[in-house]
Curated annotation (Swiss-Prot):
NAD(+) binds at residues 29-33, 78-79, 107, 130, 164, 278, 302. Keywords: DNA damage, DNA repair, DNA replication, Ligase, Magnesium, Manganese, Metal-binding, NAD, Zinc. GO terms for cellular component: cytosol. It comes from Streptococcus pneumoniae (strain P1031). The keyword Manganese applies. PANTHER family: CHROMOSOME TRANSMISSION FIDELITY FACTOR 18 (PTHR23389), DNA LIGASE (PTHR23389:SF9). The keyword Nucleus does not apply. Its cofactor is Mg(2+); Mn(2+). Zn(2+) binds at residues 395, 398, 413, 418. One of its GO terms (biological process) is DNA repair. This is DNA ligase. It comes from the Bacteria. Belongs to the NAD-dependent DNA ligase family. LigA subfamily.
Length: 652
């Protein structure tokens, strides 16, 4: 039987690839169904012989308990957005400073969910959501039900690939029709439907909803030398790759492609929200590198957002964790980009004044970045009142006087004991990107704060299980889970804690860079601002913000209390070696290396104690050059900085 099962699995997987990937089936649906039924019968009779890549794994019945966290071996960066031709020109100018004659590749930006697929010896072992780029959720069982994702590859490869999982428009219509007939709320748009489907604990539901994918990148180190060749290789492995793409030599060609795609957009069988432009050559990508948040070699052009008219009914003012007071407009409900919008941000008081927004105005609403509803402008021809909006002079939370500093656009409450700021800070501390305390969301934090059980983040680690039972709606099982989640968070690597402290200008990526360099929060506390400012991708603003924060008596007390409660203050990832051959030296890599990949060269320099930066300055000690080094080599020579080549680096 094993031989026949092998034959059937091989045949059915080949036919599935022809149907879903190549769109060129060689057998009829009835023949496929006949072979499929034969395989099901054999697997039922001989369950111990079911193969890992059997197509029957894609259907039916497994109910999951939940989704485990999964650390990405290769981080998933976000992309810098562009909304105009001018911003694309600026991107091109930045690239050409480092790469003399770049070729770009333009691909459609699919409006779906980012996923990462990992194969070991050619077998799918992990399918993961993007999450925060470093940690996602393991949804392997659900992704196995997406019919165009290969369960096995034609080669026994260890490989990680990235792509988008989406719901085709036809599937979306079918799903919503079924939900309407069952009296269930309809999904607002295909992206929400795809997200909701991938979060299903019942894998049979996922199998029925006909999700699809486009893969676009090999995340693990690639042996291809360009993005275009990488896409063709993914196709050879059996992945679905979007065929709508071009190579372009300049922004004129890119802009023409964007206009063409914009005209075709509504006729596509899936949703897109833009075009992604990348430098095609992978060596040039390595040369350009990354900012804290995004690659310097790519940009995502976003199509203009849909706009609708709505009437302003009132304005709410809320206080954030940094004391900024933000106005939010209450509006007559409108349908916008697939969802009902009745509230939209007004940004800040300067924005209200600049746009001259008044009571009862008719305004234009759009979704900034296709996500956040915002008021764009006033329809002055429909103005019914000359009365200006009431701007608060006191904090809506603590009633302290609000300040409007000359160099800021927003009103700010500077009371350090402002309840709203404290509560928002606690919510931020427990959030996924910070300490990631599962279950400790806004609702529980608000109840803990109202019950006077927590006043600062250190209090979170003093909570006992019985404290949660004092809160309305919290039962013993939930209390136990919350307590366990808090205890588990004590072991987080320290960059999570640093970000959780909510220090102004210090985001998650900056926190990671700081801890990679200083090894612990205690070392960072002792560091001077000049050393902080010298770290690649950081700078003076972050350095000054850290200096201001650590200068307060409260910060020293808080760090001591966190340490006393058992919270880890050390970085657990790869750190900079202190007493190595290049310890303390600032090094710049430039040009194309012949034998080492740029990432390998950077890792080697860092392992020898060097700090690798992206630009040459008076602070640079050494420049390692490859072919076509360009302006960085010229600047190093002008400044009299020592220059070394790849052979020298290999000899260390």
């Amino acid at each position: 039987m094993n031989k026949r099962m092998n034959e059937l699995v091989a045949l059915l997987n080949r036919y599935a690839t022809e149907y879903y990937t190549s769109d060129n089936p060689s057998v009829s649906d009835s023949e496929y169904d006949r072979l499929y039924r034969e395989l099901v019968e054999l697997e039922t009779a001989y369950p111990e012989q079911v193969l890992a890549d059997s197509p029957t794994h894609r259907v039916g019945g497994k109910v999951l308990d939940g989704f485990e966290k999964y650390s990405h071996q290769y981080p998933l960066y976000s992309l810098q957005d562009a909304f105009s031709r001018e911003e694309l020109d600026a991107f091109d100018a930045r690239v050409r400073k480092e790469v003399a004659h770049p070729t770009y590749i333009c691909e459609l930006k699919i409006d779906g969910l980012s996923i990462s697929l990992t194969y070991e010896k050619g077998i799918l072992v992990a399918g993961v959501t993007r999450g925060d780029g470093s940690i996602g959720e393991n949804i392997t069982e659900n992704l196995k039900r997406v019919k165009d994702i290969p369960l096995t590859l034609p080669e026994e490869l260890d490989i990680t690939v990235r792509g988008e999982c989406y719901m085709p428009r036809a599937s979306f219509d079918q799903v919503n029709q079924a939900r309407q007939e069952n009296g269930e709320p309809e999904f607002a748009n295909p992206r929400n439907a795809a997200a909701g489907t991938l979060r299903q604990l019942d894998t049979a539901v996922v199998a029925k909803r006909n999700l699809a994918t486009f893969l676009y990148q090999e995340a693990s180190p690639s042996t291809r030398d360009s993005q275009e060749k990488g896409l063709k290789y993914l196709e050879q492995l059996g992945f679905v790759v979007n065929p709508k793409r071009i190579l372009a030599e300049n922004i004129d060609e890119i802009w023409n492609f964007i206009q063409e795609v914009g005209q075709e957009r509504e006729n596509l069988p899936y949703d897109i929200d833009g075009v992604v432009i990348k430098v095609n050559d992978l060596a040039s990508q390595e040369e350009l590198g990354f900012t804290v948040k995004a690659p310097k070699w790519a940009v995502a052009y976003k199509f203009p957002a849909e706009e609708k008219e709505a009437q302003l009914l009132s304005v709410d003012w809320t206080v954030g964790r940094t004391g900024v007071v933000t106005p939010t407009a209450n509006l007559t409900p409108v349908q916008l980009a697939g969802t009902t919008v009745s509230r939209a941000t007004l940004h800040n008081v300067d924005y209200i004044a600049e746009k001259d927004i008044r009571k009862d105005d008719t305004v234009i609403v759009y979704k900034a970045g296709d996500i956040i509803p915002a008021v764009l402008r006033v329809v002055e021809s429909k103005r019914v009142s000359e009365e200006k909006l009431d701007i608060p002079t006191n904090c809506p939370s603590c009633n302290s006087d609000l300040l409007h500093f000359e160099d800021e656009v927003a009103l700010r409450c500077i009371n350090p004991r402002c309840p709203a700021q404290i509560m928002e800070g606690l919510i931020h501390f427990a959030s996924r990107d910070a300490m990631n305390i599962t279950g400790l969301g806004p609702s529980i934090v608000e109840k803990l704060f109202a019950a006077n059980l927590v006043k600062d983040v250190a209090d979170i680690y003093r909570l006992q299980e019985e404290d949660f039972l004092l809160l309305e709606g919290v039962k013993e099982k939930s209390a136990a889970k919350l307590y366990q989640a808090i205890q588990a968070s004590k072991e987080n690597s320290a960059e999570k804690l640093l970000f959780g402290l909510g220090i102004r200008h210090v985001g998650s990526k900056a926190s990671q860079l700081l801890l990679q360099y200083f090894h612990s929060i205690e070392n960072l506390y002792q560091a001077d601002s000049e050393e902080v400012a010298s770290i690649e991708s950081l700078g003076g603003v972050i350095a000054k913000s850290l200096q201001t924060y650590f200068a307060t008596e409260g910060s020293e007390i808080l760090l001591r209390e966190l340490k006393e409660t058992g919270v880890n203050l050390d970085y657990k990832g790869q750190t900079v070696v202190a007493d190595a051959a290049l310890s303390g030296l600032t090094v710049v890599l430039t040009g194309k290396l012949e034998r080492l990949k740029r990432s390998e060269a950077k890792s080697k320099l860092e392992s020898l104690g060097a700090k690798v930066t992206g630009s040459v300055s008076k602070k640079t000690d050494l420049v390692v050059v490859g072919a076509d080094a360009g302006s960085k080599l010229q600047k190093a020579q002008e400044l009299g900085i020592q220059v070394r080549d790849e052979a020298w680096l290999e000899s260390l």
